[in-house]
Amino acid sequence: MQTKQRIAEKLTLAFSPQSLEVLDESHQHEGHAGHRPGGETHFRVYIVSDAFDGKTRVARHRMINETLSSELAGSVHALAIHAKAPGEA
């Protein structure tokens, strides 16, 4: 399974999002630190979920980072997060 798909599946299971978009931006970082041949190192996530209601931006990021801890400890070098509650979207 590709990293992008694994990220999407884990976030879906953890947060039951109303919307989720996972973008592989690795191609934009060729030649930069953390880039590896084959990509799948730099990602951007847009997620809207009730789970984020009443949570601070930092708390939301922590929730996502905990969910993706194995990916962040492994092949993922960078993860940009845009997490919102439904009323904020």
Each predicted region: which residue ranges?
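A short, structured beta-strand/loop element
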Residues: 31-49
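Short, flexible active-site-adjacent loop segments at beta-strand->alpha-helix junctions, enriched
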Residues: 26, 51, 85-87
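N-terminal first-folded block
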Residues: 1-34
